[in-house]
């Protein structure tokens, strides 16, 4: 193995028994047909489990919706990309020439996906206890900074943070109708989310309120919240 990959292992805190798993986790789909997408899928599931378990133990009084919102903040793409940059992960990615020229090694989504793939690779290489220890070590600072106050954000913010944690495009809001006299109007807004087949809707005395209602409905439709939190 090259000296640069040995340095990466030291930064990750894990020495791979199966070096092929590490190389596969660093291989973007633009580089080869055998790439890190399956490992990313596995790593995403493991990350959500490990983060969820840690939050469950850390916040025994939190409701389901609060835990979901805390987890969305903890595992969002921005956080993962920041960790990846701390590991200099972009220097080790195997990218196709097009992605290299366009700066793919700096792109947040590619870095976050590669880190999730490495989580999947560490799980296959060493098991759940080891990957849990590594992930919790990486996220220790973020975990320590979380409080239940972080769950009091408005629905639009919570929806945006959830979608960012999944590297999805942001929701789009559109006023579809305004009814009533100028001094007593009711705004009707639709919210479009790429992960949902159907739009969600909200109404209120202002556009802002209607958008918040539509965002709350989207969170319920996505299964992130149950509407009673």
Curated annotation (Swiss-Prot):
- The RNase III domain covers 5-127
Catalytic activity as recorded in UniProt: Endonucleolytic cleavage to 5'-phosphomonoester
Where the record annotates domain DRBM, the positions are 154-224
List, from the UniProt record, the residues annotated as the active site of this protein.
44, 116
Disulphide connectivity of cysteines: none
**EC number per UniProt:** 3.1.26.3
UniProt: Mg(2+) binding residues: 40, 113, 116
- Extract one GO molecular function annotation from the record: ribonuclease III activity
Kindly give the InterPro entries that the UniProt entry links to this protein.
dsRBD_dom (IPR014720), RNase_III (IPR011907), RNase_III_dom (IPR000999), RNase_III_sf (IPR036389)
Keyword match Metal-binding: yes
Record GO biological process: mRNA processing; regulation of gene expression; rRNA processing; tRNA processing
| Requisite cofactors | Mg(2+)
According to its UniProt record, where is this protein located? Cytoplasm
The main enzyme category here is hydrolase
Q: What is its main location?
A: cytoplasm
Q: Which UniProt keywords apply?
A: Cytoplasm, Endonuclease, Hydrolase, Magnesium, Metal-binding, mRNA processing, Nuclease, RNA-binding, rRNA processing, rRNA-binding, tRNA processing
Recorded GO cellular component terms are: cytoplasm
Function text: Digests double-stranded RNA. Involved in the processing of primary rRNA transcript to yield the immediate precursors to the large and small rRNAs (23S and 16S). Processes some mRNAs, and tRNAs when they are encoded in the rRNA operon. Processes pre-crRNA and tracrRNA of type II CRISPR loci if present in the organism.
Family per UniProt? Belongs to the ribonuclease III family.
Concerning NCBIfam families, the annotation shows: RNaseIII
User: Which PANTHER family does UniProt cross-reference here?
Assistant: RIBONUCLEASE 3 (PTHR11207:SF0), RIBONUCLEASE III (PTHR11207)
Q: How does it assemble?
A: Homodimer.
What is this protein's record name? Answer: Ribonuclease 3
Species this chain originates from: Azotobacter vinelandii (strain DJ / ATCC BAA-1303)
Q: Which gene encodes it?
A: rnc
